[in-house]
Design a protein with these regions (language model features):
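Flexible, solvent-exposed loop/hinge segments and secondary-structure transition points
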Residues: 2-174
């Protein structure tokens, strides 16, 4: 009986020590990870809407209305996570950055940042998070793919596998 109690005490002590160490490591790395993520997001914002001098997050975003808008356009598994206003030096809004999460990624969620000028021109897209398979899936994060969206002003993009022939067509990954 003493041996069982002794072993239980040793295992409990090891578990408590490991838990405390894990908590300390989490506490030490939490802020640097959050800062790195915020910096990465700011870099993506600047990349997709380079004319903006500053960005202001829209705090009162109606996520339900945004989800309905996406669903009505055939994007039922996507969600708008964040919208930021891109402002020039005088504080005027010159465009928007929209962060969208697609839940249809093969390797997990795909987070995309899209920059749109006030006149509706897509200035660029940037992948915030993508965990697709090496090769085909990761082609979405190449400049060749992302540059197809740059400076396009269309109502809706069409995807083609035969090569983009018009302004509203994007060469699909295949």
């Amino acid at each position: 009986m003493n041996k069982i109690v002794k072993n239980a005490f040793i295992l409990t002590a090891i578990t408590v020590i490991a838990g405390l160490l894990l908590g300390v490591v989490y506490g030490v790395t939490k802020e640097p990870i959050a800062n790195a993520k915020a910096n990465s997001k700011q870099e993506a914002f600047q990349s997709v809407l380079s004319d903006a001098d500053s960005f202001e997050t829209v705090d009162d975003l109606d996520t339900d209305a945004a989800s309905e808008l996406l669903k009505s356009n055939g994007y039922s598994s996507d969600a708008i996570e964040e919208v930021a206003l891109g402002k020039d030096k005088s504080g005027e809004t010159i465009g928007y950055v929209i962060n969208v999460v697609s839940h249809e990624g093969y390797g997990g969620d795909i987070e995309i940042s899209v920059g749109i000028q006030a006149d509706g021109t897509v200035k660029g897209i940037e992948m915030l998070s993508i965990s697709e398979t090496a090769g085909l899936g990761m082609k979405a994060d190449t400049d060749d793919f992302k540059n197809q969206f740059r400076d396009k002003k269309v109502e809706k993009f069409q995807y083609t596998k035969t090569g983009a022939a018009s302004e509203d067509e994007i060469d699909a990954i295949s």
